[in-house]
A protein has these predicted regions:
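Alpha-helical transmembrane bundles and membrane-interface segments of multipass inner-membrane proteins
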Residues: 1-168
């Protein structure tokens, strides 16, 4: 199957987001070391706090070694499914959303879990009553899902406005 131009865009977005995620994690480990709990204020409520996340995004579903590998295998399947979907991307928001979600699943759940056995989290805004420490990939998946939802809403509005498919 041919990959659309927006499909290639989704893949490019994924690569850039993976690189940014991994660079940020390498930098944080070089800055704070590898001991969980190491913390440094940045400004206002923003702190850099190293957390070894054995669960999913925002520390959800922490568990055993079996959970680690189950999440890794599940993430690989998600990456493959999203990569196939991205090949057919026809709308910019869809391409952007898929690229960001692919990056998050690949960067967090494949690279980190295989490399470290956990995900490196470090963005800490708990002083704003947001209890989870997260990373660039967590932000990417959140933004990616928002883009897909927005894409879905906008494409549904077009279908309602032009039910016969004309005028698109």
């Amino acid at each position: 199957m041919k990959i659309t131009r927006l499909g290639w865009t989704a893949y490019a977005i994924a690569i850039v987001a993976i690189v940014l995620d991994q660079i940020s994690k390498a930098w944080i480990l070089a800055t704070l070391g590898t001991t969980p709990g190491a913390s440094q204020p940045v400004f206002g409520p923003l702190y850099l706090t190293l957390v070894h996340n054995y669960g999913m995004s925002f520390g959800l579903f922490r568990g055993t070694e079996l959970a680690r590998w189950a999440l890794t295998i599940f993430s690989a399947a998600v990456v493959i499914g999203l990569a196939v979907w991205a090949r057919k991307a026809t709308r910019p928001l869809m391409a952007g959303g898929l690229g960001l979600i692919i990056a998050a699943a690949f960067g967090n759940n494949l690279i980190d879990r295989i490399r470290y056995g956990y995900v490196v989290d470090f963005i800490d805004v708990s002083r704003l009553h947001f209890p989870w420490v997260f990373n660039v990939a967590d932000s990417a998946i959140t933004l990616g899902v928002c883009l897909l939802l927005l894409d879905s809403l906008l494409s549904e509005e077009k279908k309602i406005a032009h039910p016969d498919g004309h005028g698109l």
